[in-house]
Amino acid sequence: MYQPDFPPVPFRLGLYPVVDSVQWIERLLDAGVRTLQLRIKDRRNEEVEADVVAAIALGRRYNARLFINDYWRLAIKHQAYGVHLGQEDLQATDLNAIRAAGLRLGVSTHDDMEIDVALAARPSYIALGHVFPTQTKQMPSAPQGLEQLARHVERLADYPTVAIGGISLARAPAVIATGVGSIAVVSAITQAADWRLATAQLLEIAGVGDE
């Protein structure tokens, strides 16, 4: 049963772009996306704070679900919709502070053991990856593939789930067919020849998410 320790999210989050700039956040919100993540890596808090503030303000303006990757202290300080953490960040993060601030929490997983760890934290949603080979970040694990993804989705049938990793426009329908509630994409939009068209097509496949 879905009883998170953090505020809940819609069962289906729909299309979920993960981008590294406020410019992309604004573009995608304007294009109709309503679930997004700002993922800026390897910079100090003071270097990213202005971007986090601007992204959160945009999320509020569009009534969107904006998650901040990793910078949980800034997310709390500026009252983001939510925070997304990788497995390696869970132990070093004050989950009680995130919970007390009323922020949603998403957690990355790559196998059954990591799903167990995520479930113990009782987050708002669980991300399942990486589904396909990806060039976006170095991954220590092998791609799961659609069969493994479907098995994890079935195991987490009551939980909001997000598939991530190497999901292209061509692969998106098969990913959604597993029953996963959301697809997180990066290069499928940011490296598309026509990002507006790619976003519109992905929104048709994955939707904007439940209210």
Swiss-Prot record:
Pathway: Cofactor biosynthesis; thiamine diphosphate biosynthesis; thiamine phosphate from 4-amino-2-methyl-5-diphosphomethylpyrimidine and 4-methyl-5-(2-phosphoethyl)-thiazole: step 1/1. Keywords: Magnesium, Metal-binding, Thiamine biosynthesis, Transferase. Gene3D superfamilies: Aldolase class I. GO terms for biological process: thiamine biosynthetic process; thiamine diphosphate biosynthetic process. Mg(2+) binds at D70, D89. GO terms for cellular component: cytoplasm. Pfam families: TMP-TENI. InterPro entries: Aldolase_TIM (IPR013785), ThiamineP_synth_sf (IPR036206), ThiamineP_synth_TenI (IPR022998), TMP_synthase (IPR034291). One of its GO terms (molecular function) is thiamine-phosphate diphosphorylase activity. Its EC number is 2.5.1.3. It comes from the Bacteria. Binds 1 Mg(2+) ion per subunit. 2-[(2R,5Z)-2-carboxy-4-methylthiazol-5(2H)-ylidene]ethyl phosphate binds at T134, Q135, T136, G166, V186, S187. Belongs to the thiamine-phosphate synthase family. PANTHER family: THIAMINE-PHOSPHATE PYROPHOSPHORYLASE (PTHR20857), THIAMINE-PHOSPHATE SYNTHASE (PTHR20857:SF15). This is Thiamine-phosphate synthase. It comes from Shigella sonnei (strain Ss046). The lineage of its organism: Bacteria, Pseudomonadati, Pseudomonadota, Gammaproteobacteria, Enterobacterales. The gene is thiE.
